[in-house]
């Protein structure tokens, strides 16, 4: 019997299409806050790890290869694993079309992610 992949089943049914997408490179420590928009949100971790939380929910650690699909984005906090509690939120710096950087300008990139908003087909 074939193993059923629940995420693949959901994606097949919803057929989401990216309305907005960007690739973000991050250098620790960093933190991003976003207000809830109510739009479907996705995040794919291409390389590295981070911590993500929606609204007042618990934070979850994401690793390379992890994918998050939120049907209606609430307030979002996403940050490096070593972020001090008092670090203010960073504003992503646009490097080029669809390419952004967050965190220190020096040092190695510790996270690459593809994030954006989507809608059903």
Language-model region placement:
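N-terminal leader segment of winged-helix/HTH proteins
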Residues: 1-9, 13-14
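N-terminal regulatory/effector-sensing and dimerization cores
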Residues: 25-121
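Alpha-helical transmembrane segments
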Residues: 13-19, 117
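Short amphipathic
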Residues: 19-25
